[in-house]
Swiss-Prot record:
Belongs to the glycosyl hydrolase 6 (cellulase B) family. Has a modular structure: a carbohydrate-binding module (CBM) at the N-terminus, a linker rich in threonines, and a C-terminal exocellobiohydrolase catalytic module. The genes for catalytic modules and CBMs seem to have evolved separately and have been linked by gene fusion. This is 1,4-beta-D-glucan cellobiohydrolase C. Its EC number is 3.2.1.91. PANTHER family: 1,4-BETA-D-GLUCAN CELLOBIOHYDROLASE C-RELATED, PTHR34876. GO terms for cellular component: extracellular region. It is found in: Secreted.
Amino acid sequence: MHYSASGLALAFLLPAIQAQQTLYGQCGGSGWTGATSCVAGAACSTLNQWYAQCLPAATTTSTTLTTTTSSVTTTSNPGSTTTTSSVTVTATASGNPFSGYQLYVNPYYSSEVQSIAIPSLTGTLSSLAPAATAAAKVPSFVWLDVAAKVPTMATYLADIRSQNAAGANPPIAGQFVVYDLPDRDCAALASNGEFAISDGGVQHYKDYIDSIREILVEYSDVHVILVIEPDSLANLVTNLNVAKCANAQSAYLECTNYAVTQLNLPNVAMYLDAGHAGWLGWPANLQPAANLYAGVYSDAGSPAALRGLATNVANYNAWAIDTCPSYTQGNSVCDEKDYINALAPLLRAQGFDAHFITDTGRNGKQPTGQQAWGDWCNVIGTGFGARPSTNTGDSLLDAFVWVKPGGESDGTSDTSAARYDAHCGYSDALQPAPEAGTWFQAYFVQLLQNANPSF
């Protein structure tokens, strides 16, 4: 993938302004120089050697389940769900899984904005503070990009359960990205993952999925929306000429199959990542893409919880644009609306009645500053886009969403770094940039200044 969101450590941190860190803020880890104690009601919990986070002190991840009769019922998941120690794994999701829910505000992203971004808005930039505060409240997906982050899913779902039990109306749904394939990011370097196929990576990945499944079963009364493995399947459509991708093909397919079958649960809706218009929207790529995604769906037994595909994740394409930008190089399928409407019939013809979600987190300014459509790293001239909504105007599109947390880097511009990718050093990439997933203040400012609609 071109980035790894919600990184394990925050880069370019200013000295801590407060003696105590806020709930869900970072409180420790290798190289951390900020506050190491938490506000009342929170405890500093070490997730790994790089990252510790202030989590609710009363939070428990016990696998002992209690029975409830006050489960959430919505138009997208008929019937109530009872939390018991024995769950029948027969997915029942139908209809738009976003309908009837409000989306969870990512606490980690919110803490980045509150504890890093806003204090850094000084001088002439101080006028952006209200917009930054508003951006922190926009729901975005939580990235489970290393196995060590999986326990945070339980923490956040416990918080959602508590808010729903307190009468949240509409009830809250959680949003997560499953992103830890072995030999991840096979066609780039910026977001190489923790598992290697040559070192038991497939089994490590299955263990990672099992941990996620256990949490989803425990919180079966909480509605959860998942994006599955950004870039992975799209790489199998176009990049098998890259040795790492060719070597990873069978592992990617096996692991994706395992993910969508094991996570096929009544409280879950899944979307496979499907690249974007500038990747798979070319005439030569549409049918091969449809063949691959329909095959994955069929090979997994047509899981009821596999709702469809996610597009434009961490990218910049417009949802709908009147005039194709010059960098789209003459492809008439130059926005995400045209892309999904070109792909959907090809999928349907093979038995996959897919619906879609599109990431609008960074596509607010059109055209962008891209010099080439394939330039993906920290692109200049971008802005926050449409807020998450089911008011899409297209029956194929379930929702606009923010999958990529805006302000987290796509990759480092440091040419000496192990994960340096040349795209992050291009003239249309904002520089200097920190490692993928870490906070990039200048990029956040750019997104705020170019936001459309503005905050």
